[in-house]
């Protein structure tokens, strides 16, 4: 299904008639929401979702975007989930840590989706579009969790995304998150990396920096369509 066909089938989700909110005008009715997941492996169908964070994006009166609200959850592995030892070693996640305080996938996804829907309404947008560093990975795990729970109200577009690895490669010649942030003048602490919350907040800073830099260079105008 093409994106245009998907849009036609889902018109009416979000702001109605009248003048559009500047955010809706900027991204054709879509609200960027930055997401990062930490997982038990690479296979979204079989491997556990262990952490998820989301940052909604706001826009100021001058049309510059900024990270707005952060949502973060440590997640209990779903029943039968695969967890690779190498994945835990890479992320540093300790499943038996007494302060981990994980919640179910259902609780995590419902709370994040509730916050995203609130942001959609506030910005007059019809749907969220996932922003991620190597976004297809994060979107795959979000979609897999939605499918496992048979969730009917997923605010995210099922296949469109903004990938900051690609955007940073264009803007700064860097595709690794830490190096891209450094090139953009964003502090990045490697000791905090691979926490979903930290990576999401840094990805949000990077995305906003690239979008705002493009605006400052005169690369986008509010064209009516």
UniProtKB/Swiss-Prot annotation:
E.C. code: 3.1.13.-
Keyword Kinase (UniProt): no
Chain sites annotated for binding Mg(2+) 1: 36
Cofactor remark from the record: Binds two Mg(2+) per subunit. The active form of the enzyme binds two Mg(2+) ions in its active site. The first Mg(2+) forms only one salt bridge with the protein.
Record keywords, A-Z: Exonuclease, Hydrolase, Magnesium, Metal-binding, Nuclease, tRNA processing
Role, per record: Trims short 3' overhangs of a variety of RNA species, leaving a one or two nucleotide 3' overhang. Responsible for the end-turnover of tRNA: specifically removes the terminal AMP residue from uncharged tRNA (tRNA-C-C-A). Also appears to be involved in tRNA biosynthesis.
Family: Belongs to the RNase T family.
PANTHER family found in the cross-reference section: DNA POLYMERASE III SUBUNIT EPSILON (PTHR30231), RIBONUCLEASE T (PTHR30231:SF2)
Protein name (record): Ribonuclease T
